[in-house]
Amino acid sequence: MAFQKAVKRTVLVCGGALATVLGLSQCSHYRRKQVNLACLKAAGCHTEPVNREPPSREAQLLTLQNTSEFDILVIGGGATGSGCALDAVTRGLKTALVERDDFSSGTSSRSTKLIHGGVRYLQKAIMKLDVEQYRMVKEALHERANLLEIAPHLSAPLPIMLPIYKWWQLPYYWVGIKLYDLVAGSNCLKSSYVLSKSRALEHFPMLQKDKLVGAIVYYDGQHNDARMNLAIALTAARYGAATANYREVVSLLKKTDPETGKERVSGARCKDVLTGLEFDVRAKCVINATGPFTDSVRKMDDNKAPAICQPSAGVHIVMPGYYSPESMGLLDPATSDGRVIFFLPWENMTIAGTTDSPTKNTHHPIPSEEDINFILNEVRNYLSCDVEVRRGDVLAAWSGIRPLVIDPKSADTQSISRNHVVDVSESGLITIAGGKWTTYRSMAEDTVDTAIKVHNLKAGPCRTVGLFLQGGKDWSPTLYIRLVQDYGLESEVAQHLATTYGDKAFEVAKMAKVTGKRWPIVGVRLVSEFPYIEAEVKYGIKEYACTAVDMISRRTRLAFLNIQAAEEALPRIVELMGRELDWSEIRKQAELETATKFLYYEMGSKSRSEQLTDRTEISLRPSDIERYTKRFHKFDADEKGFITIVDVQRVLENINVKIDENTLHEILSEVDLNKNGQVELNEFLQLMSAIQKGRVSGSRLAILMKTAEENLDRRVPIPVDRSCGGL
């Protein structure tokens, strides 16, 4: 009976798909022609940027304060806000952008890192005959192709595998994926294909083998989201937009329209978050592009304005790279609760996510342990039982807030729109909300079109289709080779610089410090296991980085890849930034504390540390307890029952290992559960038990004590009969 239902369902879907194919095929040629014409038109009207390099931050602030009136003021420095600024300034409009935090500090840096058309939206469009969903997918696929073209250094096509565990699913999903290719038309990245079970396991050897039928592989795009956002903002700055981070809007300015007698929004009162200085920025039009905080700006305009944003939290986790193949992702289309989970390689690590749950609006979202465990359980369902998915392998975790919106002009005020909404208030405030990363450019185009119409601005047509972003124009896949040959950088570092900065990588390489080694000649790393170098800190300041958090999370992506590595790099990053920005010792200490707090709460360190508590059960075999107790007493020579930093220093001196005192304090603090400045035997056994269970991994104290024990054992005096002595 179930089989018959499945067959009927498949036949129904295939029939509907065939009808859709016939309908779409009629306009396929026309659509392709229109896209090509649009690209040619855009290419023909592109002008060169006003500035070869983005102006300094100080110059941007002076422009903001001294300009009598802008045509457009954009509030919000995420992908959409930066996109609006770029769209407006390239049309010839005098443009300003202000952001209360850093560019991409909110939702735009906490995505799944995909540039996708929304394959699941296409499924809904077909099953429910939803034209809006279809148009959204069609638009997103066009924007996907454009984004891959204008920022080739920051983005690339990624094959994604859809494992099939039931025979009837094969034709069902195959038809859907092929339709995805068809809707993309000339913008299709690569054609999807079917894999047999053996070929699927060859590509993804850690996949669950039992009942596996085969797999379907389709292509979407992947990018470095925070760097992409920054590239958009920097490109806008090069074209003449006055862009400034750490400028918070505290109120909207209004003036009376002489023609209508009504009050109109005419700018904003801004506050310098770093200094407290307040000043006015006047503009003919103000655009609200604040994502999840859309309603807070709307209420500045009208405190009776109804809320249109319904925030939803999406949690992601990062695991070691060996959890996924280097060049193929995985999609679980139907999790235990009906959600979709992606499992993707990114920056030599593995991203898994996402969740979708209602949340309260906050500037500092915290990933919950419940969501982290949900993702881990879904990962376990798809990976072979030979692969132990451990809680301790979660190297970073974050929560991003999706700004789901209700169209205030829709008859159904309870219906959430998955598309974007452009709203104009009675006083002329223009709000852009909703949408997704992939469609930021078309959202910006719609918003600026509306601004021009509502405020009678004189501007040219949209010019952002095919407009290269910062670093993209002269990039090539072999650019990194020149970095190796011309500057003496490591190949891994050179590849990282090329794919992060594009054709601007040479400027970073010029700043690189000599290593003092035979090879590499230049490029001192911030941490040994990642290709980030010290020169990037200096260059990051040119990219408007103001704080240590900016540097570890958005100029580099250390915080999103490994929170422990980010914490280790922090002192050096603060030292380098302090030297460039002339920070006092008090400011340096404050930056360290703020960045450490950011890692603890927002990047998953809190959840990770809670895996080891004073209530953690010790479940070790007697032989293990004996072995670990012996190891502990290598440090606790006086058998006090606890060890302090002095005990650790004494042992390290015996094996000629030098670690600075601050680092040692940090290492012991990770395990010191009752925070009394010493690690007791019971705490050490709790740590080793948690490591065995997989709840904790990478404990620096555990690694240090094991290494010390091995070195001490090697230094046991050699017996006389092994030293060629005696009879």
Curated annotation (Swiss-Prot):
Q: Which UniProt keywords apply?
A: Calcium, FAD, Flavoprotein, Metal-binding, Mitochondrion, Oxidoreductase, Phosphoprotein, Repeat, Transit peptide
A GO cellular component annotation here is: mitochondrion
| Substrates-to-products reaction catalysed | a quinone + sn-glycerol 3-phosphate = dihydroxyacetone phosphate + a quinol
Q: In which pathway does it act?
A: Polyol metabolism; glycerol degradation via glycerol kinase pathway; glycerone phosphate from sn-glycerol 3-phosphate (aerobic route): step 1/1
Q: Which GO terms describe its molecular function?
A: calcium ion binding; glycerol-3-phosphate dehydrogenase (quinone) activity
Residues binding FAD:
71-99
Explain the purpose of this protein. Answer: Calcium-responsive mitochondrial glycerol-3-phosphate dehydrogenase which seems to be a key component of the pancreatic beta-cell glucose-sensing device.
Q: Which family does it belong to?
A: Belongs to the FAD-dependent glycerol-3-phosphate dehydrogenase family.
What is the designated name of this protein?
Answer: Glycerol-3-phosphate dehydrogenase, mitochondrial
Q: To which species is this protein native?
A: Mesocricetus auratus
